[in-house]
Structure formats: C-alpha cells, structure tokens
C-alpha cells in the first residue's frame, strides 16, 4: 500500500 506513503509525501509536512 503506497497510497498512504504517497499522500504523506505529497503533504507539506516536511
């Protein structure tokens, strides 16, 4: 499941 990873990476959290 790379959906959660992609969403987290796409998020401006970093």
From Swiss-Prot:
Signal peptide: none annotated. The keyword Secreted applies. GO terms for molecular function: toxin activity. Expressed by the venom gland. Its main location: secreted. One of its GO terms (biological process) is positive regulation of mast cell degranulation. The modification N-acetylserine is found at residue 1. Venom component which lacks hemolytic or antibiotic properties, but produces an inflammatory response via mast cell degranulation and produces a chemotactic effect on leukocytes. This is Polybine-1. The lineage of its organism: Eukaryota, Metazoa, Ecdysozoa, Arthropoda, Hexapoda.
């Amino acid at each position: 499941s790379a959906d959660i990873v992609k969403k987290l990476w796409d998020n401006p959290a970093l």
